[in-house]
Amino acid sequence: MATVFDKILDSTTGRKSYDWYRKKVQAMTTPGARALINQGKATLRPKYGVKNLFGYDPKHKDKLPYYDVFPLIFPLEPARGGFIGLNFHYLKPGARVAFLRSLANTTSNKKYDKTTRYRINWRNNLYMRKTAKHYLFNHVRTSFLNITAEEMAIAIFLPVARFKKGSPY
């Protein structure tokens, strides 16, 4: 079964415009975040070097001004009881593109395919302050959908962010 990413990639051979991808994704009737996770290649733990989409129920949600229950993250490093991840949903779409472009020099190769991994030094990147979050394994509610480098330009525009109690923008 082809994933939503496969369908878009198949119809966009040779076209790299982020605006074109964004319009294509918005024109589609995309399944919800949970459906994407269920239909894609999912793992029980986050896969480092690629993006991951998963369901999450924050431990201190009652104290947060807003939070995302379906984060789209780059997991960076293990942390007590979980991991640190960069959630792209905390950035406006234009900033997501700029952030993704800024990561181009951190790739393991220039193929931008299933073999490509990102090596991010999150302590010195402009976009990190707003997006770095500590995720606890015992608050993860779904498997982790692994999103490869070739799917990332599409994934940042999928309307799967689910903020509760407000929005970061």
Task: Report the location of each language-model feature.
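A contiguous binding-surface segment within folded domains or other stable secondary-structure elements
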Residues: 32-73, 78-80
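Compositionally biased, intrinsically disordered low-complexity regions
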Residues: 16, 42, 51, 57, ...
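A residue-identity detector for tryptophan
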Residues: 20-21, 56, 122
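Mixed-charge, Lys/Arg-rich low-complexity intrinsically disordered regions
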Residues: 2-52
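Basic/aromatic-rich interaction segments and small domains that mediate binding to polyanionic partners
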Residues: 64-103
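Intrinsically disordered, low-complexity, charged/polar segments
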Residues: 90-169
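Compositionally biased amphipathic helical and low-complexity segments enriched in hydrophobic
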Residues: 10, 37, 54, 75, ...
